Amino acid sequence: CENTISGCSRADCLLTHRKQGCQKTCGLC
């Protein structure tokens, strides 16, 4: 998963997606 929304930390996106099975919680992943 990769964060695609400016202003959203990519590291936070990756951690969130690991926990939620790569659901779209931080933009298009």
UniProtKB/Swiss-Prot annotation:
ShKT domain ranges (all copies): 1-29
Gene Ontology cellular-component annotations: extracellular region; nematocyst
Cysteines paired by S-S bonds: 1-29, 8-22, 13-26
Keywords for this protein: Disulfide bond, Nematocyst, Secreted
Domain of life: Eukaryota
Subcellular location: Secreted; Nematocyst
Result of changing residue 28 to Y: No gain of activity on Kv channels
Effect annotated for changing residue 16 to Y: No gain of activity on Kv channels
Keyword Cell inner membrane: no
Function: This peptide is similar to the potassium channel toxin ShK, but does not show activity on potassium channels. It appears that Lys-19, which is expected to occupy the pore of the channel, is not sufficiently accessible for binding, and therefore that this peptide must have a distinct functional role that does not involve potassium channels. It is noteworthy that this peptide is much more stable in the presence of trypsin, chymotrypsin and pepsin than the toxin ShK.
Note: Does not show activity against grass shrimp (Palaemonetes sp.) and brine shrimp (A.nauplii). Does not show activity on the voltage-gated potassium channels tested (rKv1.1/KCNA1, rKv1.2/KCNA2, hKv1.3/KCNA3, rKv1.4/KCNA4, rKv1.5/KCNA5, rKv1.6/KCNA6, Shaker IR/Sh, rKv4.2/KCND2, Kv11.1/KCNH2/ERG1, hKv10.1/KCNH1/EAG1).
Family: Belongs to the sea anemone type 1 potassium channel toxin family. Type 1a subfamily.
Protein name: ShK homolog Ask132958
